[in-house]
């Protein structure tokens, strides 16, 4: 625990490069501690017509706030970002920022086909009062280190908001993140998606830099990662309240209690690996009708079968005592 406090003290001592920049009145300066924790990747709800369901999206925002998430991210991979149009990303980014109203940090996904599109998203995110930016690599999946550096540098050049970067191509290694962190002061969160995220977290933490290591992977390694002094995870929305409890209990020194909740969460995370992101939508549908349906934009086929649904029944029954909403 003392090592965790030492790292956080180090983080707190390094001011964000964005602190000196002017921001829209509705934006806030995030402390280093506020950049850590459970930053949920929001799901994107659709009507049967495949248009985005704004009412359900707003309910998801409120649901996540009530789950006490440390932050939320939209759009990103779990939010079917590649299926969204340019106009939709602009319109519904503002819907989310307006709905959340500063109750928890909102990071807007700014990745694009190229640096010019990404720069436009980044400018817009700051204009509407987002708290941070989240970026994957360019949509051509470039792994060229020079091109990737140019792309992320361009994003950082048009906004002083803290930047979260998600590993999304083979060229985005831990070494790449460390080099990029030296170059871009606003690059604060490195989201690791490699085959062995816990080991890469240890490498990032051991380097003693200002980067905060976060992970994807559905949160399946969360306890292991926290033991290595991770800065959080970015998983789906369905069991957000359990994720928050795991994080908060662990960092309060209640490791056994955190593991007990994690065991309930892990059963869902394992099922998601087989069923895909549709599971998150099914959970949100069941949890008080946050979503009205489970429509995915890429397929009309419902990919969960009877046995999957029965397994989810049992998982949700076991997790119910930990639901906040």
Where are the model-predicted features located?
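N-terminal secretory signal peptides and thylakoid transit peptides that target proteins
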Residues: 1-17
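C-terminal alpha-helical cap/extension of soluble enzyme domains
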Residues: 11-14, 41, 226-230, 237-325
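C-terminal segment of N-terminal export signals and the immediately downstream linker at the start
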Residues: 22-54
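Active-site beta->alpha loop and helix N-cap motifs at the rims of alpha/beta catalytic domains
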Residues: 32, 46, 51-168
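Structural preference for beta-strand elements that scaffold enzyme active sites
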Residues: 37-39, 71, 105-107, 132, ...
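A general structural signal for well-ordered alpha-helical segments in protein cores
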Residues: 57, 89, 93, 118, ...
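Alpha-helical structural signal in soluble globular domains
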Residues: 91, 95-99, 124-128, 154, ...
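Catalytic alpha/beta core domains of metabolic enzymes, predominantly
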Residues: 169-265, 269-273
């Amino acid at each position: 625990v003392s090592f965790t406090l030492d790292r956080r003290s180090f983080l707190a001592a390094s001011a964000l490069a964005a602190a000196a920049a002017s921001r829209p009145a509705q934006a806030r300066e995030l402390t280093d501690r506020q950049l850590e924790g459970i930053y949920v990747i929001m799901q994107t709800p659709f009507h049967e017509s495949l248009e985005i369901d704004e009412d359900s999206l707003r309910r998801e925002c409120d649901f996540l706030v009530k789950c006490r998430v440390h932050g939320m991210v939209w759009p990103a991979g779990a939010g079917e970002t590649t299926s969204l149009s340019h106009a939709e990303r602009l319109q519904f980014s503002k819907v989310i920022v307006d709905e959340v109203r500063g109750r928890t940090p909102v990071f807007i996904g700014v990745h694009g086909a190229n640096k010019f599109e990404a720069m436009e998203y980044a400018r817009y995110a700051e204009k509407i009062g987002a708290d941070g930016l989240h970026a994957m690599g360019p949509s051509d999946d470039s792994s060229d280190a020079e091109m990737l550096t140019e792309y992320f540098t361009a994003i950082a050049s048009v906004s002083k908001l803290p930047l979260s970067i998600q590993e999304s191509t083979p060229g985005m290694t831990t070494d790449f993140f460390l080099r990029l962190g030296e170059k871009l002061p606003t690059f604060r969160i490195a989201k690791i998606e490699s085959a062995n995220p816990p080991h890469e977290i240890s490498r990032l933490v051991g380097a003693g830099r200002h980067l905060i290591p976060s992970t994807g992977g559905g949160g399946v390694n969360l306890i292991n990662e926290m033991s290595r002094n991770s800065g959080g995870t970015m998983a789906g929305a369905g069991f957000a309240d359990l994720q928050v409890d795991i994080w908060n209990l662990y960092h309060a020194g209640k490791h056994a209690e955190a593991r007990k909740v994690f065991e309930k969460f892990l059963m869902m995370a394992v099922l998601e690996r087989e069923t895909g992101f549709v599971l998150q939508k099914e959970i949100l549908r069941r949890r008080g009708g946050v979503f009205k349906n489970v429509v995915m934009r890429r397929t009309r086929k419902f990919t969960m079968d009877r046995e999957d649904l029965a397994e989810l029944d049992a998982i949700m029954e076991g997790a119910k005592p930990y639901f906040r909403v």
